[in-house]
């Protein structure tokens, strides 16, 4: 995964995790999963509801929070290349 992808994904998922925001995760096959983000790494998201499910990121199409989320994002410095 590119560094830019991590700059967007990690703060978003971490905010959802820390604030215990309910999410709907849509998979590429159309299945909808719901719960709270328990943990995540480069390849998987642990989604907790009545049980904890390990969802591979390559199978995720969309992550929809139940409410608006403010993402702490620091833009990388602009280089004069």
UniProtKB/Swiss-Prot annotation:
Residues 10-69 form the Sm domain. InterPro entries: Hfq, LSM_dom_sf, Sm. One of its GO terms (molecular function) is RNA binding. Keywords: RNA-binding, Stress response. GO terms for cellular component: cytosol. The keyword RNA-binding applies. GO terms for biological process: regulation of DNA-templated transcription; regulation of RNA stability; regulation of translation, ncRNA-mediated. It comes from the Bacteria. Pfam families: Hfq. Belongs to the Hfq family. NCBIfam families: Hfq (TIGR02383), PRK00395.1 (NF001602). Homohexamer. RNA chaperone that binds small regulatory RNA (sRNAs) and mRNAs to facilitate mRNA translational regulation in response to envelope stress, environmental stress and changes in metabolite concentrations. Also binds with high specificity to tRNAs. This is RNA-binding protein Hfq. The gene is hfq.
């Amino acid at each position: 995964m590119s560094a830019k992808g991590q700059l967007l994904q990690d703060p978003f998922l971490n905010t959802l995790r820390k604030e215990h925001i309910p999410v709907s995760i849509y998979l590429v096959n159309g299945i909808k999963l719901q719960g709270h983000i328990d943990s995540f790494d480069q390849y998987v998201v642990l989604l907790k509801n009545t049980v904890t499910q390990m969802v591979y990121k390559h199978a995720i199409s969309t992550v929809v929070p139940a409410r608006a989320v403010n993402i702490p994002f620091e833009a990388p410095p602009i280089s004069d290349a």
